[in-house]
């Protein structure tokens, strides 16, 4: 996960570190064996295999595995939790050297380059403060060049109000468009029912934007 809340960055680092220290990869509610909808949306952008892609809050997610499997060669994963990143590195083994790993709070991070695809599944909905959402949007604007793509998956308006002991803010494509401003045009939005490892269905929305200017 990646982001800041009123409880503070250091406390959030401790929180997520404890989550990944005390639970197995398959024991967290957001676990996906195969991140099918994320992959489908990334494919829909039409970017080439050498396109720079960043996964925000990617931590222990298996999206990076799938991107490497599909031949993408410029993948970056950013997460607030070093423990989550370590889980992915261990799972990938030697292939982890093909990925750039960044442990950082996305709301304070300064992008070192631009990306053709910015993907975020679940990190954004943990930003409960308006100033943190604004800081996130500023990073997106700096990191995604005109013509680039932004994919954000969050709990939908009828989704959970909390996750892993933390409050979340639920979104739809309209609320995301309002936060992102006029530089990003909505291309598509999808509703998604995620079934947790415990069998609970959580309602998500995924929105794909293209930077227009």
Can you annotate each of these PLM segments?
Residues 116:
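Conserved acidic residues
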Residues 122-126:
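Short catalytic micro-motifs in class I SAM-dependent methyltransferases
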Residues 2-113, 127-143, 149-213:
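Class I (Rossmann-like) S-adenosyl-L-methionine-dependent methyltransferase catalytic domain
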Residues 119:
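A conserved beta-strand element that flanks and buttresses the S-adenosyl-L-methionine
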């Amino acid at each position: 996960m990646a982001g800041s809340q009123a409880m503070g960055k250091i406390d959030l680092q401790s929180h997520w570190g404890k989550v990944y220290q005390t639970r197995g990869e398959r024991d967290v509610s957001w676990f996906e064996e195969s991140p099918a909808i994320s992959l489908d949306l990334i494919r829909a952008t039409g970017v080439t295999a050498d396109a720079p892609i960043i996964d925000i809050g990617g931590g222990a997610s298996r999206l990076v595995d799938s991107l490497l499997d599909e031949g993408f060669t410029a993948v970056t994963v950013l997460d607030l939790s070093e423990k989550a990143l370590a889980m992915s590195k261990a799972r990938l083994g030697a292939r982890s050297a093909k990925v750039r790993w960044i442990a950082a709070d996305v709301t304070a991070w300064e992008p070192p380059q631009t990306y053709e695809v910015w993907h975020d599944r679940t990190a954004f909905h943990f930003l409960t403060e308006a100033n943190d959402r604004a800081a996130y949007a500023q990073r997106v604007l700096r990191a995604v060049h005109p013509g680039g793509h932004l994919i954000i998956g969050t709990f939908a308006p009828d989704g959970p109000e909390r996750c892993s002991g933390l409050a979340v803010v639920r979104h739809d494509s309209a609320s995301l468009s309002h936060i992102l401003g006029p530089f990003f045009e909505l291309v598509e939005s999808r509703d998604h029912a995620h079934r947790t490892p415990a069998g609970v269905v959580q309602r998500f929305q995924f929105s794909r934007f293209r930077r227009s200017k």
